[in-house]
């Protein structure tokens, strides 16, 4: 399907989720769309969806009473009042075209989500990276405080097993997506902006336009509410200065001496991270998380600051963060095979790539670090090639897959073949594999006992963890490290890669689709 989504968004109004009638979601299996479906179903709303692949989330939707069609066809719209699509759905998708022909209400995912927020105090988390983890932390802190928030997150909280919940309380926590400007729909009571860096330049053109969009998002915050951003981030600091000059209520966090919530004595190890927090010279005590990484500490500080400003008990923040289980695909431990530890990480932008690999280096200790990376989107790989290449070189070895860019056309010289040349690693420590099945074979050939391997990048790369563990296990059963049954590296592919069981029309939705 060649058409591109041409979404034009309407601001959130007084329309409620119940006003939408029977809802149909095109591409219901991705994290963002399945979370929205779960939210509507638990509110007692009739929900159907269409998919081409049996995503793990679909069983849960069926159990809640959702109807899932394993096809895309016009008959799926019979009895439907509202059709919901994401930015990953092309404008010429047959169900989208048919919905408009029938005169059905057609809403972008963000517009549909906004209806669920009507009458609630929304806490919206935006930023170039760290959104999903931060949204999860804010959610758990509010849950621990006993306010039972509703939430929709672009990932699954590991122990909860879900990225959405319809709560009984006044608060609604949402991950706000800037990639297509749809975060400008929301009218938050609290806006959290983790950081601002160049990304989604296919939408914004340059960093200045992106920063302007984040400022516009912050200006939508309720005058009685407040804006939170990171004093340690250059973009966040600029945003705070701009908004404060306009008389808006802005609060910052970080290790910077002028941060409103100042973090001191921050220490990270393989067991997690700890820091002390103070505001206006008053100590708020010690905060600990069982996940490592300075960036995790900064993410958690925004949740602490929100809890403080909402006048909720800080003890709730301390206990919630101390038990934070992590989020699927965010520093997720997949398992161990033949004494090789395998992780999965969603990072695809240079900054989170670097942060994740540095943290994994701590985990690896004296062992090696191998990254299996699948770039996400051709435009990003092209525009940020030098920065991505430099970040990947933090690893000891690189196994590179082809770019995952559904709907994108590759120009000569673009893609992973160009990226591999730019990575400043020795030739024998980096390899571009042009077929999906070749990657586990290559990892099993390279990994030594004591090494750490991480799958990283586009959504499909999360599917490789079990294959890696299987290849490593078979290697261990077969003999010494470095030998593995299997074929040669190689094979033809396309921009999307030869990814098992993901038909071209069924890609992860926009909330997970950079």
Swiss-Prot record:
UniProt keywords, alphabetically: ATP-binding, Cell cycle, Cell division, Cell shape, Cell wall biogenesis/degradation, Cytoplasm, Ligase, Nucleotide-binding, Peptidoglycan synthesis
UniProt pathway annotation: Cell wall biogenesis; peptidoglycan biosynthesis
Reactions it catalyzes: UDP-N-acetyl-alpha-D-muramate + L-alanine + ATP = UDP-N-acetyl-alpha-D-muramoyl-L-alanine + ADP + phosphate + H(+)
Region (Disordered): 495-514
InterPro entries: Mur-like_cat_sf, Mur_ligase_C, Mur_ligase_C_dom_sf, Mur_ligase_cen, Mur_ligase_N, MurCDEF_pg_biosynth, UDP-N-AcMur_Ala_ligase_MurC
E.C. numbers: 6.3.2.8
Localization per Swiss-Prot or TrEMBL: Cytoplasm
GO biological process: cell division; cell wall organization; peptidoglycan biosynthetic process; regulation of cell shape
GO cellular component terms, semicolon-separated: cytoplasm
Residues the record lists as binding ATP: 127-133
Coiled coil (residue ranges): none
EC class of the enzyme, as a word: ligase
Gene3D superfamilies: Mur ligase, C-terminal domain, Mur-like, catalytic domain, NAD(P)-binding Rossmann-like Domain
Function of the molecule: Cell wall formation.
Family: Belongs to the MurCDEF family.
Protein name: UDP-N-acetylmuramate--L-alanine ligase
Organism of this sequence: Salinispora tropica (strain ATCC BAA-916 / DSM 44818 / JCM 13857 / NBRC 105044 / CNB-440)
Taxon lineage: Bacteria, Bacillati, Actinomycetota, Actinomycetes, Micromonosporales
């Amino acid at each position: 399907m060649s058409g591109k989504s041409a979404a034009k968004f309407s601001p959130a109004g007084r329309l409620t989720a119940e006003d939408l009638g029977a809802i149909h979601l095109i591409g219901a299996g991705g994290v963002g769309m399945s979370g929205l479906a779960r939210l509507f179903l638990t509110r007692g709303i009739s929900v159907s969806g269409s998919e081409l692949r049996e995503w793990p989330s679909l069983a849960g939707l069926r159990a809640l009473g959702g109807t899932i069609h394993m096809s895309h066809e016009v008959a799926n719209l019979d009895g439907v009042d509202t059709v919901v699509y994401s930015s990953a759905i092309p404008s010429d998708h047959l169900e989208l075209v048919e919905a408009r022909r029938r005169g059905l209400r057609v809403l972008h995912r963000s517009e549909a989500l906004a209806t669920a927020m009507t009458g609630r105090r929304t806490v919206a988390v935006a930023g170039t990276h760290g959104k999903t983890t931060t949204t999860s932390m804010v959610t758990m802190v509010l849950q621990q405080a006993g306010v039972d928030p509703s939430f929709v997150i672009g990932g699954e909280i590991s122990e909860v097993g879900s990225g959405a919940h319809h709560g009984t309380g006044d608060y609604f926590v949402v991950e706000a997506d800037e990639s297509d400007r749809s975060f400008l729909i929301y009218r938050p009571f609290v806006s959290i902006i983790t950081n601002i860096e160049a990304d989604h330049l296919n939408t914004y053109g340059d960093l200045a336009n992106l920063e302007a969009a984040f400022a516009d998002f912050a200006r939508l915050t309720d005058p009685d509410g407040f804006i939170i951003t990171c004093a340690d981030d250059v973009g966040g600091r600029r945003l705070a200065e701009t908004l404060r000059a306009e008389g808006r209520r802005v609060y910052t966090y970080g290790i910077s001496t002028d941060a409103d919530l100042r973090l001191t004595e921050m220490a990270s190890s393989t067991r997690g991270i700890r820091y002390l927090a103070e505001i206006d010279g008053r100590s708020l005590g010690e905060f600990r998380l069982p996940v490592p990484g300075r960036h995790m500490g900064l993410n958690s500080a925004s949740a602490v600051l929100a809890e403080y400003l909402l006048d909720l008990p800080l003890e709730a923040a301390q206990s919630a963060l101390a038990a934070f289980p992590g989020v699927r695909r965010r520093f997720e431990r997949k398992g161990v095979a033949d004494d090789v530890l395998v992780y999965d990480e969603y990072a695809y932008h240079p900054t989170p790539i670097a942060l994740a690999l540095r943290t994994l280096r701590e985990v690896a200790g004296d062992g090696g670090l191998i990254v299996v990376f699948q770039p996400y989107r051709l435009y990003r790989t092209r525009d940020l090639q030098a920065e991505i290449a430099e970040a990947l070189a933090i690893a000891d070895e690189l196994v590179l897959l082809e770019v995952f860019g559904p709907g994108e056309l590759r120009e000569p010289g673009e893609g992973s073949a160009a990226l591999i040349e730019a990575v400043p690693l020795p030739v024998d420590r980096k390899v571009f594999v042009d077929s999906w099945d070749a990657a586990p074979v290559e990892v099993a050939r390279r990994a030594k006992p004591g090494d750490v391997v991480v799958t990283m990048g586009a959504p499909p790369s999360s599917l490789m963890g079990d294959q890696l563990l299987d290849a490593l296990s078979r290697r261990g059963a077969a003999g010494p490290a470095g030998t593995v049954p299997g074929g040669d590296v190689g094979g033809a592919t396309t921009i999307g890669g030869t990814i098992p069981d993901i038909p071209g029309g069924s890609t992860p939705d926009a909330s997970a689709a950079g």
